[in-house]
Protein backbone atom coordinates (compact mmCIF):
# COMPACT_ATOMS: atom_id res chain seq x y z
CA UNK A 1 0.00 0.00 0.00
CA UNK A 2 1.21 3.53 -0.77
CA UNK A 3 -0.25 6.78 0.50
CA UNK A 4 -2.19 7.51 3.70
CA UNK A 5 -3.67 4.58 5.61
CA UNK A 6 -7.18 5.92 5.01
CA UNK A 7 -6.75 5.10 1.30
CA UNK A 8 -6.35 1.37 1.99
CA UNK A 9 -9.41 -0.44 0.59
CA UNK A 10 -11.41 2.78 0.71
CA UNK A 11 -15.06 3.30 -0.18
CA UNK A 12 -16.90 6.62 -0.25
CA UNK A 13 -20.64 6.61 0.49
CA UNK A 14 -22.56 9.84 -0.03
CA UNK A 15 -26.23 10.71 -0.33
CA UNK A 16 -26.57 12.86 -3.44
CA UNK A 17 -24.60 13.39 -6.62
CA UNK A 18 -22.22 16.29 -5.82
CA UNK A 19 -21.81 15.32 -2.14
CA UNK A 20 -18.76 13.24 -3.04
CA UNK A 21 -16.82 16.23 -4.34
CA UNK A 22 -17.97 18.45 -1.47
CA UNK A 23 -17.21 16.11 1.43
CA UNK A 24 -14.60 13.65 0.10
CA UNK A 25 -12.82 15.57 -2.64
CA UNK A 26 -9.36 14.62 -1.40
CA UNK A 27 -10.05 10.88 -1.64
CA UNK A 28 -12.00 10.47 -4.87
CA UNK A 29 -9.21 9.13 -7.03
CA UNK A 30 -7.94 6.82 -4.27
CA UNK A 31 -11.32 5.24 -3.51
CA UNK A 32 -12.01 1.76 -4.78
CA UNK A 33 -15.73 2.52 -4.73
CA UNK A 34 -17.71 5.76 -4.86
CA UNK A 35 -21.29 4.97 -3.87
CA UNK A 36 -23.95 7.65 -4.37
CA UNK A 37 -27.38 6.86 -3.03
CA UNK A 38 -30.14 9.08 -4.40
CA UNK A 39 -31.41 9.68 -7.91
CA UNK A 40 -35.00 10.78 -8.52
CA UNK A 41 -36.51 13.65 -6.57
CA UNK A 42 -40.29 13.33 -7.09
CA UNK A 43 -41.77 16.51 -8.48
CA UNK A 44 -38.42 17.70 -9.84
CA UNK A 45 -38.04 16.13 -13.30
CA UNK A 46 -35.34 18.56 -14.44
CA UNK A 47 -33.15 17.77 -11.43
CA UNK A 48 -33.72 14.06 -11.91
CA UNK A 49 -32.79 14.26 -15.61
CA UNK A 50 -29.77 16.40 -14.77
CA UNK A 51 -28.53 13.84 -12.28
CA UNK A 52 -28.81 11.08 -14.86
CA UNK A 53 -26.76 13.15 -17.29
CA UNK A 54 -24.19 13.99 -14.62
CA UNK A 55 -23.76 10.39 -13.58
CA UNK A 56 -23.37 9.31 -17.22
CA UNK A 57 -20.56 11.86 -17.57
CA UNK A 58 -18.86 11.07 -14.26
CA UNK A 59 -15.13 10.66 -14.98
CA UNK A 60 -14.30 7.80 -12.58
CA UNK A 61 -15.19 4.17 -13.29
CA UNK A 62 -15.45 3.46 -9.55
CA UNK A 63 -18.89 5.11 -9.40
CA UNK A 64 -21.79 2.99 -8.12
CA UNK A 65 -25.04 4.98 -8.31
CA UNK A 66 -27.89 3.34 -6.40
CA UNK A 67 -30.62 5.64 -7.80
CA UNK A 68 -32.86 5.40 -4.76
CA UNK A 69 -35.82 7.79 -4.67
CA UNK A 70 -35.45 10.82 -2.42
CA UNK A 71 -38.09 11.06 0.29
CA UNK A 72 -38.53 14.83 0.47
CA UNK A 73 -37.82 15.04 4.20
CA UNK A 74 -35.15 17.76 3.99
CA UNK A 75 -35.37 20.32 6.82
CA UNK A 76 -38.32 18.54 8.47
CA UNK A 77 -36.54 17.46 11.66
CA UNK A 78 -37.04 19.57 14.77
CA UNK A 79 -33.84 21.55 14.43
CA UNK A 80 -31.72 22.47 16.31
CA UNK A 81 -32.56 19.51 18.56
CA UNK A 82 -33.99 16.74 16.37
CA UNK A 83 -35.26 13.43 17.66
CA UNK A 84 -32.82 10.71 16.64
CA UNK A 85 -34.06 7.35 15.39
CA UNK A 86 -32.53 4.10 14.17
CA UNK A 87 -33.15 5.20 10.59
CA UNK A 88 -31.98 8.83 10.89
CA UNK A 89 -33.94 11.65 12.49
CA UNK A 90 -37.68 11.96 12.90
CA UNK A 91 -39.25 13.93 10.00
CA UNK A 92 -42.05 16.02 11.50
CA UNK A 93 -45.14 16.37 9.26
CA UNK A 94 -45.77 19.92 10.49
CA UNK A 95 -42.33 20.93 9.22
CA UNK A 96 -42.57 19.51 5.70
CA UNK A 97 -40.95 21.59 2.98
CA UNK A 98 -41.50 19.50 -0.17
CA UNK A 99 -44.73 18.19 -1.66
CA UNK A 100 -42.87 14.88 -2.05
CA UNK A 101 -42.52 14.59 1.77
CA UNK A 102 -42.74 10.84 2.49
CA UNK A 103 -41.62 9.91 6.01
CA UNK A 104 -42.81 6.32 5.58
CA UNK A 105 -40.47 5.84 2.62
CA UNK A 106 -37.68 7.46 4.64
CA UNK A 107 -38.13 4.81 7.33
CA UNK A 108 -38.46 1.90 4.91
CA UNK A 109 -35.51 2.84 2.74
CA UNK A 110 -33.12 2.71 5.68
CA UNK A 111 -33.31 -1.09 5.73
CA UNK A 112 -33.13 -1.33 1.94
CA UNK A 113 -30.07 0.91 1.95
CA UNK A 114 -28.37 -1.21 4.62
CA UNK A 115 -28.89 -4.33 2.52
CA UNK A 116 -27.44 -2.66 -0.58
CA UNK A 117 -24.45 -1.31 1.33
CA UNK A 118 -23.72 -4.57 3.13
CA UNK A 119 -22.81 -6.22 -0.17
CA UNK A 120 -20.90 -3.24 -1.51
CA UNK A 121 -18.86 -2.51 1.62
CA UNK A 122 -17.82 -6.09 2.28
CA UNK A 123 -14.03 -6.26 2.21
CA UNK A 124 -13.53 -2.52 2.67
CA UNK A 125 -11.08 -1.38 5.35
CA UNK A 126 -12.01 2.34 5.33
CA UNK A 127 -15.26 4.13 4.52
CA UNK A 128 -15.87 7.87 4.23
CA UNK A 129 -19.52 8.83 4.74
CA UNK A 130 -21.59 11.72 6.05
CA UNK A 131 -21.36 12.71 9.70
CA UNK A 132 -24.00 11.84 12.33
CA UNK A 133 -25.24 15.44 12.26
CA UNK A 134 -25.45 15.57 8.47
CA UNK A 135 -22.92 18.41 8.03
CA UNK A 136 -25.39 21.30 7.62
CA UNK A 137 -28.31 19.21 8.84
CA UNK A 138 -29.60 17.19 5.87
CA UNK A 139 -31.87 14.36 6.92
CA UNK A 140 -30.74 12.22 3.96
CA UNK A 141 -27.10 12.63 5.00
CA UNK A 142 -27.94 11.50 8.52
CA UNK A 143 -29.74 8.41 7.24
CA UNK A 144 -26.76 7.48 5.07
CA UNK A 145 -24.48 7.85 8.09
CA UNK A 146 -26.75 5.64 10.20
CA UNK A 147 -26.86 2.93 7.54
CA UNK A 148 -23.09 2.92 7.07
CA UNK A 149 -22.33 3.12 10.81
CA UNK A 150 -24.66 0.20 11.53
CA UNK A 151 -22.46 -2.02 9.33
CA UNK A 152 -19.03 -0.95 10.60
CA UNK A 153 -18.62 -3.58 13.33
CA UNK A 154 -20.23 -6.32 11.25
CA UNK A 155 -17.98 -5.75 8.23
CA UNK A 156 -14.91 -4.56 10.11
CA UNK A 157 -14.22 -1.24 8.41
CA UNK A 158 -13.18 2.07 9.95
CA UNK A 159 -15.64 4.91 9.41
CA UNK A 160 -14.49 8.45 8.65
CA UNK A 161 -16.76 11.52 8.55
CA UNK A 162 -16.38 15.22 7.64
CA UNK A 163 -15.90 17.60 10.55
CA UNK A 164 -18.02 20.37 9.06
CA UNK A 165 -21.07 21.62 10.91
CA UNK A 166 -23.52 24.48 10.51
CA UNK A 167 -24.99 26.49 13.39
CA UNK A 168 -28.24 24.52 13.35
CA UNK A 169 -26.38 21.20 13.79
CA UNK A 170 -24.28 22.25 16.79
CA UNK A 171 -26.52 20.48 19.33
CA UNK A 172 -26.59 17.21 17.38
CA UNK A 173 -22.84 17.36 16.84
CA UNK A 174 -22.27 17.82 20.57
CA UNK A 175 -24.28 14.66 21.26
CA UNK A 176 -21.92 12.63 19.09
CA UNK A 177 -18.50 14.09 19.82
CA UNK A 178 -17.75 11.46 22.45
CA UNK A 179 -18.01 8.73 19.82
CA UNK A 180 -15.46 10.28 17.47
CA UNK A 181 -11.82 9.21 17.34
CA UNK A 182 -8.69 11.00 16.25
CA UNK A 183 -8.98 13.09 13.08
CA UNK A 184 -7.36 12.13 9.81
CA UNK A 185 -4.39 14.15 8.64
CA UNK A 186 -5.20 16.93 6.20
CA UNK A 187 -5.04 15.59 2.64
CA UNK A 188 -4.48 17.55 -0.57
CA UNK A 189 -7.35 17.90 -3.02
CA UNK A 190 -6.93 16.94 -6.66
CA UNK A 191 -8.04 20.34 -7.91
CA UNK A 192 -8.18 19.33 -11.56
CA UNK A 193 -10.46 16.37 -10.84
CA UNK A 194 -12.63 18.39 -8.46
CA UNK A 195 -13.02 21.14 -11.04
CA UNK A 196 -13.91 18.60 -13.74
CA UNK A 197 -16.63 17.03 -11.59
CA UNK A 198 -17.93 20.41 -10.41
CA UNK A 199 -18.24 21.53 -14.02
CA UNK A 200 -20.34 18.47 -14.82
CA UNK A 201 -22.78 19.43 -12.08
CA UNK A 202 -22.87 23.03 -13.30
CA UNK A 203 -23.50 21.94 -16.87
CA UNK A 204 -26.34 19.63 -15.79
CA UNK A 205 -27.72 22.15 -13.26
CA UNK A 206 -27.57 19.68 -10.45
Region locations from a protein language model:
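Active-site rim/loop-helix segments in enzyme catalytic domains that contact anionic ligands
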Residues: 1-122, 154
